[in-house]
């Protein structure tokens, strides 16, 4: 779950309240942001992650970095769209052959990243226009990758 600092306490509480185990937080460093004089730059989002069960230490997944440095994508479909290379890295926390659920699919980046990395995936998007555009994007990019 990608959030800014203001939602960090509520997001981690909600994850645990839903019965999941909060596993930690990573950082997406976007590199640049709108400067605010007299304040720290808001150039990062937090990645809150957890599991709905045990995660043995010997799982066949790589050790991922705690900070991911990727700029915002150009020509975004959705306001909060994430860069595809970032999501291709993040989905690797899932065991090989795993299934990835994105309940806020937006432009479909997580679903596309999951499929490109060999996972199955389900995306849920409540806004019809974004769902349509995400589906078209995923289909087009998968055709190009084939």
Task: Label every model-predicted segment.
Residues 1-132:
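Core catalytic lobe of class I
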Residues 135-146:
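Short, conserved SAM-binding/catalytic segment
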